[in-house]
A protein has these predicted regions:
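Active-site core segments that coordinate phosphate-bearing ligands/cofactors
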Residues: 75-86, 109, 144-145, 151, ...
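Acidic low-complexity intrinsically disordered segments
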Residues: 126-199, 281-425
Length: 425
């Protein structure tokens, strides 16, 4: 079972409040969860609506896992210190740079913690060789330097129209993770909120308070998570930038939710979610925003210049809850195994009554084709290209992935997965 960190942070906030969370939110609220950890930045949006006389939380959008976080900040501070040492005539090797990065992390935490009155922290870079102690390099990192590098570099004041920039990349690069090219967290946030402007439009029972002509989805409440945001300076900058966007767009300022646990929220929230899965507590709902279909080729004689017609078979209905599975489709289909094949997926926010097994031969503009998926399914001793009779069953995971299983008559299964989360930054 997987659970996204922002959602886990919100579960922790609910659990820690002992029921008082209802006093901090109201119908029509949109909660923005900003999770800034050591290696990633994540955004989520949760709407507050009324259902049968009670408040209900409904997740309406999830951002990508942006590889940008506290580690980037530590490297940036280490670069500042290295430049100071190089101006003094010192050159650092890779081992010393690694030690410097660790020292910069510790200095950052000291200088930016709540209630800290420290203005500078000494930095010691160990030497290598026989003079390990006497040959160490010494300098300091000041609070002013940390705030300048982190606040202006990672949380710049930008307009809501700002977008992450992408530099021209070299033709060859080392294999590695797809790190964010733009370090501006506020630019990533602006892009996320702009893409989600319609995220609450089809949410039954939600009363939006966004003004006419809004250019991005307006959060009304903020919840922070992650050790980086223990700094009041960084927290204040995010609130400042977001509320400036809201004011310019004609909306009220967002308020900060009280009672967040920035260190242990993910662990505690995950434990509380296990409690929720047993039918207790408060569940954050997150049904699919579309009905989903898979393409099925017609069996027909070959005709020169003519592709076989494709029908769309509904496998997951509109509003299907995450963490649940749909019943198997009644149709028996033939699955091609042992050779490269292509799955075609479609989504529809218009056809809300279709159920698993609904087959569409024509759909005009009601369906939108999603990214195609290529795969070679294991043949398990069968000849390549063999056709296996199967029925399909879909499920939606807790992290918004559509999982499609093809189940043979003897119980053998093949599985493919497609990310069907709402568009995000």
């Amino acid at each position: 079972m997987l659970l996204e960190e922002p959602q886990s942070a919100l579960y922790s906030w609910i659990q820690r409040s002992n029921g008082a969370w209802r006093e901090q939110v109201k119908i029509g609220d949109v909660i923005l969860v900003v999770d800034l950890g050591g290696g990633t930045t994540d955004f989520s949006l949760i709407a507050v609506l009324e259902r049968e006389g009670s408040l209900e939380l409904h997740r309406v959008a999830v951002g990508d896992h942006i590889l940008l976080g506290g580690d980037n900040m530590d490297l940036a501070l280490a670069h500042v210190v290295r430049m100071k040492l190089e101006r003094e005539g010192h050159t650092l090797d890779a081992w010393q740079l690694s030690a410097l990065t660790h020292a910069a992390r510790g200095a950052k935490e000291q200088l930016l913690s709540h209630g800290s009155d420290v203005d500078a922290v000494p930095i010691v870079v160990p030497s290598r060789g026989s003079k390990l102690i006497g040959g160490s390099l010494r300098t300091e990192l000041t609070k002013a330097e940390v705030e300048r590098v982190l606040v202006e570099g990672f949380f710049p004041v930008v307009d809501a129209t700002a977008r992450p920039t992408a530099r021209a990349r070299g033709a060859l690069t080392q294999m590695g993770l797809p790190y964010a090219q733009d370090a501006g967290v506020t630019r990533h946030l602006a892009a996320f909120l702009s893409k989600q402007i319609g995220a609450t439009e089809d949410l039954a029972g939600f009363r939006s308070a966004m003004p006419q002509g809004a250019t991005f989805l307006h959060p009304t409440a903020l919840l922070f998570n992650g050790g980086v945001l223990k700094s009041p300076v960084l927290e204040a900058r995010i609130v400042e930038v977001l509320n400036a966007w809201l004011a310019k767009d004609g909306g009220p300022p967002a308020r900060l939710l009280e009672g967040a646990d920035l260190d242990l929220a993910v662990a505690r929230g995950a434990a509380y979610y296990a409690y929720v899965r047993r039918g207790r507590g408060v569940r954050i709902r997150g049904g699919t925003a579309q009905s989903y279909y898979v393409g099925v080729e017609s069996a027909m004689p070959a005709v020169p210049g003519m592709e076989p017609p494709v029908s769309a078979l509904c496998v997951a209905p509109f509003g299907m809850e995450e963490g649940t599975e749909a019943p198997p489709t009644p149709q028996e289909l033939a699955l091609v195994v042992g050779e490269p094949v292509m799955f075609r997926f479609f989504g529809s926010s218009a056809r809300r009554d279709d159920q698993p097994g609904t087959m569409l031969d024509r759909w005009e503009r009601e369906l939108t084709e999603l990214p195609r998926l290529e795969a070679t399914l294991a043949s398990e001793g069968r000849p390549a290209g063999d056709l296996v009779p199967v029925r399909l069953r879909a499920s939606v995971t807790e992290v918004g992935t559509l999982r499609l299983e093809a189940i043979a008559n003897d119980g053998e299964r093949w599985r493919v997965e497609l990310d069907v989360r709402a568009p995000s930054a």
